[in-house]
Amino acid sequence: MPPFAVPTELARRYDVCFKSIAIGKWVNLDMLAVRDPDVLIDEIDPEFYDEDERLPYWAEIWPSAIGLGRHLFEYPAPAGSRILELGCGIGLAGIAAAAAGLAVTACDYEEDALAFARYNARLNALDGRVSFRFLDWRNPDLDRKYAIVIGSDILYERPNHDPIQRLLHETLEKGGMFLASDPDRRAAAPFVESMIARGYRHSAQPRKVKFESKDNRVIVHRFLKAD
């Protein structure tokens, strides 16, 4: 049993379960998740999708988020560094960053995703290190800059590339770093090319992530903004 109850609204609307995810050598994160996210896709109203093309990808625990969380443990930023997470979903990567000693602002476009993420931060006793807020990266309303911005599996749709890059231009400090993990999708390649053309230095680290008995290939892209 969890140490405190699942919020009534989440328990009413979703079939939920708990999963334990190994992040660091001695660090496991317990995560409240949707048991079968595919059910949510099957239930989408086509008119609702056509209006804003919103699919419930936030409900998945993605191997890319696991890979990014592990990367943050293996290559730690200075303790207390303030970072911004884009598209946090149920919170795995941002909560992993908080467990690694970072001060995290995690954002998503879906209020239910943020509700899961807040619960998961509290579940792992990290709600004091991570805050959550709504963000539409097409119209960001951020009032500060960050040394580090992260995102897992957010490069899959090319129409999102330009809004993400504009947000990074406005939000990432000079000399700052953007970490983006991706399951080696072809859609990531034009994003990388565009970032390099904008003056970012790029490197990539492939990782193997085993999750739910399946081996997954994840690429952690590292972009450094010019000073």
Task: Name each model-derived stretch.
Residues M1-D227:
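S-adenosylmethionine-dependent methyltransferases
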